[in-house]
Amino acid sequence: ICSTIEELNQIFGSKYVQSNTIKGFEQFNNKDKFVVIGTPCQIDSVRRYIKKRKIEENFVLIDFFCHGVPSMKLWNKFSASQRNKIGNFNSVTWRNKVDGWHKSYRLDIIADSGEYHHTGLKFDDFFNLYFSNAALSPACFDKCKYKQDQSSADIRIGDMWGADYSKNKEGVNSVICFTEKGNKAVKEIDCTIKRHTFEEVLSGQMNFLPIRDNFFYRLNPLIIADSENWNEITTRFRKMFLKKRIMRKVKSIIKIFSKK
């Protein structure tokens, strides 16, 4: 829980793993005001918790358009591999926009020694595993009920993709208010607001459940297994990914020649 701007800055930035919220729950009370931000399933749990304790009025709940969350085991294995390379670290930033909003798929790590490391989407196995859906939690597939406009939050946020902002380098946020409390909170913020239809906002988001494909069934057992390390997982993934790219290329060539 943050109570100052300085503390808030420490958690600034996109995250691709869920936060451990147990200590946060322990500090909830009926005297202070809280803004809680988390994945849609986390926020649903918070809503149930505060509703049962009749302290909802003290809270503004915010979730976001969620692609899904990877297994914590995958993150732990990735972290261990990074520590072997650069030593201990306590600063990780996802989606750094130093090169612009549209080129923000990068991972930045600052080691305790002060050494700075970063990789882009093209070369980062964690990002590629994440976007292949192979590393997502099983609950994100057939049990997620928080896509599109399904939410227990007051406000949902995300990136505002689309042709209108294709040349914008700073980034544009989409904000959807589900409750009057959320609407009031957004109106009190000193920012520029431009209205869009819900369909326009949704068009740039993953609004359907991910599909369990061959990547998931072959890689997920390795991710879960304590005996498999990061290098073994990524080696298998790269081989599968290369095979898939080759198959796509062959199919596209066949499709081109079949039209002639």
Segments from the language model and where they lie:
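Iron-sulfur-associated redox domains of electron-transfer enzymes in respiratory
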Residues: I1-K260
